């Protein structure tokens, strides 16, 4: 667990993530959906903090240990994925289970790890969070938000890499949006890669997803330009 790694110090972290990266490399895995760069702001947070998924409460601690993780992955040509943008460590709820509003708990310092990695060109991919913050977007949660994914992450923070959604079948999304809405909003928001884990809800086939996206492009509800941009970023 990240919290335990941070308690044992930098040398332990380096050895731990060196071994992990070696295992991934030997297994033929080229991408790790890690590290979590959420700040442990809310001690009662059941999805990040109490599970020990955060390196700490301060952005400096999170940046220090996540940098070690990313560096060990990079040495072995393994892609890292920072998550969960714009921050899930202050939430009270679990987005696996339902709608999560962080309007009154989110702090702008939760962006600090992302600012650091983007500024220093150390980030390959970023994963979105299914959290709602009316101060950032009064209508949609982050994964479906153009204001957050394009205006904030790309235009303001300068991120040029691949943006991947968290599992779109988590109940924060699937209980409030149908497949067509989810695909349309997420793609148009600036998400480049869509994640469907097929664990929490009725399985959705790749054909269903492709057919729905294609239909929405023909209906001019999904931007073809965005599809082309996503393909270029992923390639």
Q: Positions of the model-derived regions?
A:
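Glycine-rich, aromatic-flanked loop segments that form ligand/cofactor-binding clefts
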Residues: 16-40, 62-86
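Second-shell residues forming the walls of enzyme active-site clefts
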Residues: 63-216, 221-225
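Active-site-proximal loop/short-helix segments
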Residues: 1, 30-52, 79-99
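Glycine-rich anion/phosphate-binding loops
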Residues: 7-21, 60-64, 106-108
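Active-site loop-helix segments enriched in His/Asp/Glu that coordinate
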Residues: 45-56, 202-209
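A charged helix-plus-loop insertion that forms the helical arch/lid used to bind
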Residues: 1-8, 52-56
């Amino acid at each position: 667990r990240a919290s335990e790694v941070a308690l044992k110090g930098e040398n332990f972290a380096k050895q731990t993530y060196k071994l992990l990266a070696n295992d991934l490399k030997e297994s033929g895995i080229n991408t790790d959906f890690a590290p979590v760069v959420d700040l442990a702001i809310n001690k009662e947070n059941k999805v990040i903090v109490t599970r020990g998924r955060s390196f700490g409460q301060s952005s400096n601690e999170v940046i220090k240990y996540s940098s070690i993780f990313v560096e060990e992955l990079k040495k072995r040509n393994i892609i890292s994925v920072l998550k969960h943008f714009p921050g899930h460590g202050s939430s009270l709820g679990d987005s696996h289970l339902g709608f999560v509003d962080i309007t009154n708990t989110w702090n702008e310092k939760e962006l600090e790890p992302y600012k650091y990695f983007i500024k220093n060109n150390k980030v390959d991919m970023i994963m979105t969070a299914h959290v709602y913050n009316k101060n950032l977007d009064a209508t949609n949660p982050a994964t479906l938000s153009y204001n957050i994914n394009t205006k904030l992450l790309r235009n303001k923070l300068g991120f040029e890499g691949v943006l991947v959604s968290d599992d779109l079948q988590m109940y924060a999304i699937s209980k409030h949006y149908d497949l067509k809405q989810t695909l349309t909003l997420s793609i148009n928001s600036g998400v480049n890669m869509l994640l469907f884990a097929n664990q929490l809800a009725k399985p959705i086939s790749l054909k269903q997803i492709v057919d729905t996206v294609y239909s929405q492009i023909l209906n001019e509800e999904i931007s073809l330009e965005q599809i082309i941009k996503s393909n270029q970023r992923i390639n």
